[in-house]
Design a protein with these regions (language model features):
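Acyl-thioester C-C bond-transforming condensing/cleaving domain
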Residues: 54-182, 263-301
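Conserved "HGTGT" condensation-loop signature of ketosynthase/thiolase-family condensing enzymes
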Residues: 1-49, 53-56, 62-72, 141, ...
Length: 301
């Protein structure tokens, strides 16, 4: 018994820089691929961080829920659905999985939809650069409870000590009247090594707790640098790595679902028993979870 990925959806087209539109589009595609109606989604969780025009209110999840066409009618007897933002940087998707497990395992909802993705608040570009190292992309994971011995194991989290390694903020002393389109991102010297250390600790905890053989496991990790997943795999003794398309830069909160979606599309999970999801980012903090694949790996997604 566990919580499994029913389907995935992504959006990376260049016709918009809006993360609300990209995330809503990814959500709709995941529902269409699974043949699941919007009213069957009880909860939508948005794990994205950087949003259109630095929107604070309303919750961006509500805007994405509307864009996805979920729970738009308020008639007597209609199925209830709600949404909320869960903002914890690069680890947000796995934290959302943690919440989804509690909801689905208690039959609180038939499906939980996790969306993630980031954009520059100026809505003027989609590719990463030195000042804002994150690429615009939207991704969705549709989850459901299953009686089969597949799906996510426990999500393990690790909090580091010292300075945050990576941080972002709007500099109110410099923004003037342009604050809604500005974002400052700072990466400390040696941030990759610090994130690697804490990610490895989280990954080992997940592997050891579930007694997983690294040889039969694929690593899907966050991408604070292009080589980070491979470095982490070497540290953990895992030979297989799957990554998202990094041609435009780091997709940040969308990295894990984008990589899983790509691996399923390319049938590159066949022959493996498990995926180890690991994310690490600001804090520094890290999260990891083992995902037991169905026999036909990824066929449902």
């Amino acid at each position: 018994m566990g919580v499994a990925i029913t389907s995935t959806g992504i959006s990376r087209e260049g016709d918009t820089f809006s993360i609300v539109e990209h995330s809503g589009r990814a959500a709709r595609r995941s529902l269409e691929r699974a043949g699941v109606a919007p009213e069957q989604v009880g909860v939508l969780i948005n794990a994205g961080i950087f949003r259109d025009s630095n929107t604070v209110e309303p919750a961006v999840s509500a805007l994405i829920q509307k864009e996805a066409g979920i729970g738009l009618d308020y008639r007597f007897g209609d199925p209830r659905s709600f949404s909320f933002d869960l903002m914890n940087g690069a680890t947000g998707v796995l934290n959302a999985v943690q919440v989804a497990q509690s909801i689905l395992e208690t039959a609180g909802s038939g499906h939980v939809l996790i969306v993630s993705g980031d954009t520059h608040p100026s809505l003027a570009r989609s590719a990463a650069d030195d000042e804002f190292p994150y690429a615009t992309a939207g991704a969705a994971l549709l989850l459901e409870h299953t009686d089969e011995p597949v799906g996510f194991g426990r999500v393990h989290t690790v909090a580091g000590s010292g300075s945050p390694a990576v941080q972002s903020y709007v500099d109110v002393t410099m923004m003037g009247t342009a604050g809604r389109g500005l974002m400052t991102v700072e990466r400390e010297p040696g941030f990759e090594d610090r994130l690697l250390e804490i990610a490895a600790e989280a990954g080992r905890r997940a592997l050891d707790a579930d007694e997983i053989d690294p040889v039969a496991t694929v690593l899907i990790a966050s991408t604070p640098t292009p080589k980070f997943p491979q470095l982490l795999a070497e540290t953990l003794g895992i030979g297989a790595v799957r990554t998202p398309d990094l041609s435009a830069g780091d997709p940040h909160t969308a990295s894990l679902p984008l990589a899983y979606h790509r691996a399923v599309e390319e049938d590159s999970l066949i022959g493996f028993d498990t995926v180890l999801f690991v994310a690490a980012g600001a804090g520094p903090s890290a999260a990891a979870a083992v995902y037991r694949l169905p026999v036909a790996a990824g066929a449902a997604a």
